[in-house]
A protein has these predicted regions:
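Short, conserved beta-strand element in jelly-roll/cupin
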Residues: 9-25, 71-74, 79, 104-108
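Residues in well-ordered beta-strands of folded domains
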Residues: 5, 17, 31-33, 102-104
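Non-heme Fe(II)/2-oxoglutarate
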Residues: 77-79, 83-134
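Alpha-helical and His/Cys-centered functional microenvironments
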Residues: 9, 38, 90
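Short helix-to-loop capping/linker segments positioned immediately adjacent to catalytic or ligand/cofactor-binding
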Residues: 3-4, 18-20, 64-68
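Double-stranded beta-helix
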Residues: 25-85, 110
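Histidine-centered catalytic micro-motifs
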Residues: 2-8, 85-88
């Protein structure tokens, strides 16, 4: 997704990215909001079920984001906790694109179950979440 989002498969999710081509700014580099995984864990379920993605315009006006971009050469391997805000940045028309492999590592059983997720929600709506965090 080209909007910032979190992956909802598992709160213990870890992804590995391997670039097979050089990735420059216009090639759609992986982009991550540094330390966002800590804030997101507190609001995991509301983001998972209430907000599919967050446009950058919604974030940048209210938050000074500490963004890390994966602008790297072919052969680069990096790890990301994609429970934090991340995206694949927009690809420019001049770009030849990028080729990468992504591996996902998840727990055997998520630490939270659907039976108790309502009691873990610190916010009552996506609107409440956005107002208090962004």
């Amino acid at each position: 997704s080209q909007n910032f989002h979190v992956d909802g498969e598992d709160p213990l999710l870890l992804k590995v990215f391997i670039y097979f081509t050089d990735v420059k700014d216009g090639d759609g580099p992986f982009t991550y909001v540094k330390k966002s995984h800590k804030a997101i864990r507190q609001t995991y379920f509301i983001l998972r079920y209430g907000v599919a993605s967050i446009p950058e315009s919604r974030l940048s006006n209210k938050t000074k984001l500490n963004i890390i971009q994966g602008i790297e050469s072919s052969g680069t391997i990096f790890f990301a906790d994609t429970n934090g805000l991340h995206r694949g940045a927009k690809i420019s028309q001049e770009s030849k694109g990028r080729i990468l492999m992504m591996l996902s590592f998840v727990s055997k059983w998520p630490i939270r179950s659907s039976k108790n997720e309502e009691s873990l929600l610190p916010f009552t709506s996506a609107k409440d979440l956005m107002a208090k965090n962004f």
